[in-house]
Amino acid sequence: YCDWSSDVCSSDLDLFAHQTNVDLQNHCICFNTVKLGKSMQSIGMMTVLDQIWNRITRNRVLGRRTWIFTDEFQLLLGNSACTNYYFELSSRARKWGAILTSITQHVRSVLNNEDARRMLSDCGYIKLLNQAPDDANDIARLLHISDEEKRYIENAEVGSGLLIADKVVVPFNNTFPQDTELFHLMDTNPNRKK
């Protein structure tokens, strides 16, 4: 028998039993759960999602929009409680003045999760970069992309892909000159980092 509440409040799992060092009044807040151990991932992500919902509700009262950017979205999908919470949040966010952006490099995780598939198919704006052939086929079926459009996300060059906005599909090429300072600031390729 384990008294979960006493473990979280007074053991080595008491991470959330103290005052936060995050300034929750700031206009821009970044939550990073990457350093949480496996035993704390679930409660950490649920705490973050709860804080996000609290901010959405406060901002709604104040007449403000809330922008939420979730990077490494696939990490939420590994926990059913987090997936369910995020799905509910995404279902209500727009009506509450929030704009939700979910980012992943692992689209297969999204395609393999029914709630995530529903979130993807309900999106008003989707940006797709290069995809593996099987993933591109599944995305094309889910989002009703033609074979002609699908070729823009199969073997696509870096910076190229498809934008889908309210069912309008537009191919794009956003290649950036590599000899600029701005390119080096934005570049995420570790092989090119100095």
Regions found by a protein language model. Name each.
Residues 14-22, 62, 152-156, 167:
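Short coil/turn segments at secondary-structure boundaries
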Residues 3, 24-26, 63, 121, ...:
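Short, solvent-exposed coil/turn segments
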Residues 11-21, 26-28, 160-161, 171:
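GHKL/Histidine-kinase-like ATPase module
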Residues 1-8:
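Single conserved hydrophobic/aromatic residue that forms the stacking wall/gate
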Residues 143-193:
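Conserved P-loop NTPase
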Residues 34-152, 178:
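Conserved P-loop NTPase motor cores
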